[in-house]
Amino acid sequence: MAISTLTLTQSLYTRSFRPTIFFSSSSSSSFSCLCSSSSDCEPKLSVKKRVFGVGLGFLASSILSLTPLDADATRIDYYATVGDPLCEYSYAKSGLGFCDLDVGFGDEAPRGVLVNIHYTARFADGTLFDSSYKRARPLTMRIGVGKVIRGLDQGILGGEGVPPMRVGGKRKLQIPPKLAYGPEPAGCFSGDCNIPGNATLLYDINFVEIYPGSNTR
């Protein structure tokens, strides 16, 4: 996976990295050699070695110059496509399934405040259909006032046997159709709909923060 490149050390690049360089045979400056004997190819091979050395130098410098921002971008791409670990759901009377991976360390969100969350959203078969990580910023939403689907409100704010989330918490939600978009398709544009009717939705929620300066209303 792309994430694994973040753990490589400089020694690995210099000792075990073996790049493959391809030379086009269609170019007039091609290094392809069609000859009847090895001696006819020696001058071209020496040129190839010099070019290979220069190319390897550029390649090594570009790899070793991986910045923290590059690493963050790779992590964002990783979390946009890979879900949190599996856990066993508990179920509220409403039918909402919930499971805490991390209870969190901060405050609970009062009804009506703005909160920032990161999330990935999947269908019941595991197919990803939305993720805040792909946009590289959390979603800002007003909690508990009907601005989002009922399953998200209840899953974050709590109620009916669901404990409220705390800042820093990570929770998995299994949202039945009646707490999501119901029997009608959703996310439709020009006749194409992202979410079919009667879809059960799976959310991985990361409660980032209560929006600074947010007030209930």
Swiss-Prot record:
Source taxonomy: Eukaryota, Viridiplantae, Streptophyta, Embryophyta, Tracheophyta
InterPro entries according to UniProt: PNSL4/FKBP13-like, PPIase_dom_sf, PPIase_FKBP_dom
Transit peptide segment: 1-34
Protein name per the record: Photosynthetic NDH subunit of lumenal location 4, chloroplastic
Annotated S-S bridges: 87-99, 188-193
Gene Ontology MF: a single term: peptidyl-prolyl cis-trans isomerase activity
Function, as annotated: NDH shuttles electrons from NAD(P)H:plastoquinone, via FMN and iron-sulfur (Fe-S) centers, to quinones in the photosynthetic chain and possibly in a chloroplast respiratory chain. The immediate electron acceptor for the enzyme in this species is believed to be plastoquinone. Couples the redox reaction to proton translocation, and thus conserves the redox energy in a proton gradient. PPIases accelerate the folding of proteins. It catalyzes the cis-trans isomerization of proline imidic peptide bonds in oligopeptides. Seems to be essential for stabilizing the NDH subcomplex A.
Domain of life assignment: Eukaryota
Residue ranges of domain PPIase FKBP-type in the record: 112-211
Cell compartment(s), UniProt: Plastid, Chloroplast thylakoid lumen
Annotated family: Belongs to the FKBP-type PPIase family.
Record keyword Isomerase present: yes
Main location: plastid
Keywords from the UniProt entry: Chloroplast, Disulfide bond, Isomerase, Plastid, Rotamase, Thylakoid, Transit peptide, Transport
Outcome of gene disruption: RNAi mutant displays impaired NDH activity.
Subunit record text: Part of the chloroplast NDH complex, composed of a mixture of chloroplast and nucleus encoded subunits. Component of the NDH lumenal subcomplex, at least composed of PnsL1, PnsL2, PnsL3, PnsL4 and PnsL5.
EC number of the protein: 5.2.1.8
Gene: PNSL4
Catalyzed chemical reaction(s): [protein]-peptidylproline (omega=180) = [protein]-peptidylproline (omega=0)
Gene Ontology cellular component annotations, sorted alphabetically: chloroplast; chloroplast thylakoid lumen; chloroplast thylakoid membrane; plasma membrane; thylakoid
